Amino acid sequence: DMHYEWQDENWMKDRKKNNALDAPWSVYEVHLNSWMRPDKNDEESYNSYAQMQELLVPYVKEMGFTHIELMPVMEHPFDGSWGYQGTGFFAPTSRFGSPQDFMKLVEAFHQAGIGVILDWVPSHFPYDAHGLFMFDGTHTYEYADMRKGYHPDWNSYIFNYKRGEVKSFLISSARFWFDKFHADGLRVDAVSSMLKLNYSRTEGQWEPNEFGGDGNIEAIAFIKDLNETTFRDFPDVQTIAEESTDWPGVSKPTFAGGLGFGMKWMMGWMHDTLDYFKLDPIERQHHQDKFAFSMMYYYDENFMLPLSHDEVVHGKSPMIYKMPGDDWQKFANLRLLYSYMFTHPGGKLLFMGNEFGSTTEWNYKSELPWELLQHPSHKMLKDCVRDLCFLLRNEPALYEKQFVQDGFEWIDLNHRQESVIVYRRKGILPENDLLVILNMTPVVRNDWKIYAQGKETWKEVFNSDEKKYWGTGDVFNPAPVVKLVDKNTQQYEINVHLPALGAVVLK
C-alpha cells in the first residue's frame, strides 16, 4: 500500500523556484545509517525514518543548507555497499521503517523548506540470487556478453540498455521516486561507467561500438530518454550527473546534442582545489594556475562543486587533515577553502562531518564523531559553514548568475608571490555585486589595494578570521578606505586588511 496524505503543498507549489538553476544550491550529503545512531557503540542500531525527522531535519535547517542528498535509500542487502549495490529499485530500505515513514521524512524536509535529492544507481546491480541477476535463469536485465555485462570495479552486473523492457524498468523507477516520494532530484551515480564501453577495461576486455568508438550508444540513448521523460513529466525537479570524464554536453539539453542532465559534478574543480590546499602556503605561488583553471571550462556545463563521501574514505584522510600547518592553520585553511567554495560559481555539495572538521575518515559502521563539537575549533568551524550557507542564500550575486558568463569576473590573479586572489560575483542588480578576496598565505596584509569598478562605499559582509570562527579576530574591515582613481571608467582603489589564511567578502 503506497497511500499517503501529503501535506507539503506549499513546497510543491514553489519548488520550481527552489530547484531552478538561478537559485542557491548548498547540498548536505548524508548516509542515513551512519549520520547518528541511537547507540554509537552498536553498529547494528539505526535511527528510524521517524527519529531522523526529529534529529536530521532541524539540524539541516539550522545549518542553512538548501537541499539534502541521501546516499541510496533504495533497498540493498549489504550495508558495506553504502547503498550502491541495490536490489529494490521500487522500495526505500526497510531498515528504517515503512514507505510511509520515508514519505513523512521527505514531507518534513519540505515543510522545513529543504529539497530532497536521492542518489540513484542505474549503472549496475549486485549478483545476489534474490536480486535481478539471471532473473528468470537467463540474462534478463544484464547484457549476456560479459564484456558489456560485467563490472570489474564493483563485481556487479550492467543493465542491458538495448532492451526496451530494461529501459522501461529503470525510467519507471526514476518516475516512481518523483511521483510517489516527492523527490526533488536524482543524483545519478557512475554515469561515466555507463557511457564508456572501455571503462575500467583493458584492451581485449571490451568491444568497440558499431562505429568503432568507445561510447555505449544504447546507454547514451537511455540517458537522453531518462532526462527527456523526467523533465517532461516533472519540469520542476533536477537530475544531477556524477560524471568524471570530459564527455561533452552532459548538462546540455538533448535538443542541443547534450545528455540532458540539469547539472553535473565538477570533479576537476574538486581535484585541483584539494591539490592546491594540501600545499604548504609557500608553494602555492607556483600553483596559482590551478585556481584560474576551473573558470576556463566552468561554463561548459552547469556544475556542482562536490566535496563528497568519496574524498574522505579509502586512506584519502578527512578534510581537516588534508590541510597543512599546525592546528590553528589547518582550521584557517579549511575555513578558507569553504569560503572559496561557497563564493565560486555553481552548486555546492558537502558530505556530512565535513562541516565540523571530522578528524576520522568516514566509516559506515559508526556514527559521526559528534563529541568533537565540545571543542571550540570544531564548533566554530561548523558555525562558519552555517554562516556561509546563509551568505549564499542571502546574497543574490552568489546564485542569480551562477551559470551565466557575466556573473563572474577575475579582478586580480597577478599577485602570485603573495598568493592573494580577488574576484567579483555579479547579481542582476549592480548594487548586489560582491568582491571576494582570498589570502592563501599565513601572512597578514594590511592596506592591500584592490582596483575595481563600482561604488564608493563597500562594507565587509563576511570574514573567515572572526573570533567566532576560531580566527584571530584582529584583522577586519568595518569601512574600507575607497578613492576614485579614474572618473571615466569609475575605477576605485579599495584598501583592505587581509587576515592570514583568510577570506574577506565585500559588498
What are the functions of these language-model segments?
Residues 182-184, 199-367, 372, 393-450, ...:
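Conserved alpha/beta catalytic core and glycan-binding cleft of carbohydrate-active enzymes
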Residues 12-18, 280-282, 290-294, 409-411, ...:
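Short, P/G- and charge-enriched loop/turn segments at secondary-structure junctions
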Residues 38-53, 320-323, 468-486:
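Short, polar loop/linker segments at the starts of domains and inter-domain junctions
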Residues 48-52, 98-101, 165-170, 215-222, ...:
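Soluble or luminal CAZymes and related metallo-dependent hydrolases
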Residues 377-398:
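Catalytic cores of secreted or luminal carbohydrate-active enzymes
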Residues 9, 14-25, 31-215, 496:
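Substrate-binding/active-site clefts of carbohydrate-active enzymes
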Residues 477-507:
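C-terminal beta-strand-rich structural cap/linker in extracellular carbohydrate-active enzymes
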